[in-house]
Every structure is written in C-alpha cells, then in structure tokens.
Amino acid sequence: MVLVYLNSNLNLRSLKETNHDFLINSTERLTTNQILSTSVILTTMNDLTNWARLSSLWPLLYGTSCCFIEFASLIGSRFDFDRYGLVPRSSPRQADLIITAGTVTMKMAPSLVRLYEQMAEPKYVIAMGACTITGGMFSTDSYSTVRGVDKLIPVNVYLPGCPPKPEAIIDGVIKLRKQIAQENTNQKHFSFEHKHRYFSTNHKLNYPTTCYNENSVNLLSQQLSNNDLFSFMKIPVDNCFTEE
C-alpha cells in the first residue's frame, strides 16, 4: 500500500478523470491485485490522521450515577464496543475521550475540569443522560447540581435519556467518529463558549443566619421552662427560609 500526499493546490478534478478511486475513511478490507489503480491509495495527511483518530478512541469512564450501568453493559459480549476501537482507560493522560454519565455536583466540578485538562489533545466529550445535559430532575430546586456539564467543559455529542439505551450510546460513538472524520488538523477544533442550550430555572431559596421562627419558638416554649428557653435561645428570631 502506497500513501501519496496530495498538495492542497493540486487539482483533484484531473485525478478523478483518470478513474482513480479515492478511499477516504473506508471500513472495507483492502485487497491488492495486478492492477495498479486498485493497489495505490491516494489520500491526504488530514484524512489519514482523522482515520487513525476515529479508529482508536480511548475513553475515560466518568460514571457518577445510574447512567453508567447502561454504559457498563457495552463492555460485555452482547454489544462488544471493542469493534469500534474503544479501549477503556483509567488514566486521563492515556485517554482522548471522556464520557460523563450521571449527575455532576458543584464539589465534583473542579475535579472534572482537572481531568479534562489532563487529557491529551485532541480530546472529545460525550454527555450521557439527562442529569449530565440539563441537570435532570435536580435542575429546578437543587443547590448542589451543575445544570449542564457543557458549562464546565465543551461537549461534542449529547445523549439524552434517563438513562439512554446501549444502542443510543453506540449511535453517539458513530456520530462522534463522523465528526472526527471531517475535522481539519491544521485548525483548533474547539471554540468553547458558555451558552445556555436549554431552559433552566435557578432556585429561589435564601439562607439566613438563623433557622428559628415564631412557630419553632412556641414549640420550644411548650417543652422547656422559661429559664431553659432564655438560656437556649441566644439568636434573634427570624424566618428560616424566605422567598425572593
């Protein structure tokens, strides 16, 4: 097999007129014979690099919730995701794909960003599940849930579902492979901007310094004597939660 580097200024139309077959990101097995036109493959370094990347994706499994159980079934023999060249890695320095499956909390956000920064370039992200994409059922009144992992790291493929099926995960990997096949290695493949890609509402809870109101004082006064109550209550009475 001979690989010929084509200059960008070369006229490809003249080559097509000579009945040359262009095999770009082909998955079929190559065969050689006595005919020269089927023994020589004409391609570019860009397509060759993209073919090598999409054929050897090494994912870093970042499972935090029930969505990861669906992804774990892909490792078995029923779905066999090794046929796509995926090799699970436990170190971010050996991975070029991170799959976030499950809820991401505020305390876990710095660790996730650090794992993403330690991955080798070029790197890709698949957001798996409703909790990862929008916060899921925790997106309305949760104070500790990140409402979308794309606010922390750039996302290439979104897999909605609660949880998504293994077939949907395979389809997401195929779509990511198509994105990699169309990339230009001379350009930066990410222009990350913080955007709201979904409708989300922030919680309206305000946390004062005390958690005692008039009802709690009345309940305590019925159970304790006056001396014990005055010695116990050293904080001014205020509402526990007030709505803005």
From Swiss-Prot:
It catalyses: a plastoquinone + NADH + (n+1) H(+)(in) = a plastoquinol + NAD(+) + n H(+)(out); a plastoquinone + NADPH + (n+1) H(+)(in) = a plastoquinol + NADP(+) + n H(+)(out). Signal peptide: none annotated. GO terms for molecular function: 4 iron, 4 sulfur cluster binding; iron ion binding; NADH dehydrogenase (ubiquinone) activity; quinone binding. It is a peripheral membrane protein. Pfam families: Oxidored_q6. Its cofactor is [4Fe-4S] cluster. It is found in: Plastid, Chloroplast thylakoid membrane. The keyword Plastid applies. Its EC number is 7.1.1.-. The keyword Transferase does not apply. [4Fe-4S] cluster binds at C66, C67, C131, C162. GO terms for cellular component: chloroplast thylakoid membrane; respiratory chain complex I. GO terms for biological process: aerobic respiration; electron transport coupled proton transport; photosynthesis, light reaction. Keywords: 4Fe-4S, Chloroplast, Iron, Iron-sulfur, Membrane, Metal-binding, NAD, NADP, Plastid, Plastoquinone, Quinone, Thylakoid, Translocase, Transport. It comes from the Eukaryota. HAMAP family: NDH1_NuoB. NCBIfam families: nuoB_fam, PRK06411.1. Belongs to the complex I 20 kDa subunit family. NDH is composed of at least 16 different subunits, 5 of which are encoded in the nucleus. NDH shuttles electrons from NAD(P)H:plastoquinone, via FMN and iron-sulfur (Fe-S) centers, to quinones in the photosynthetic chain and possibly in a chloroplast respiratory chain. The immediate electron acceptor for the enzyme in this species is believed to be plastoquinone. Couples the redox reaction to proton translocation, and thus conserves the redox energy in a proton gradient. PANTHER family: NADH DEHYDROGENASE (PTHR11995), NADH DEHYDROGENASE [UBIQUINONE] IRON-SULFUR PROTEIN 7, MITOCHONDRIAL (PTHR11995:SF14). This is NAD(P)H-quinone oxidoreductase subunit K, chloroplastic. The lineage of its organism: Eukaryota, Viridiplantae, Streptophyta, Charophyceae, Charales.
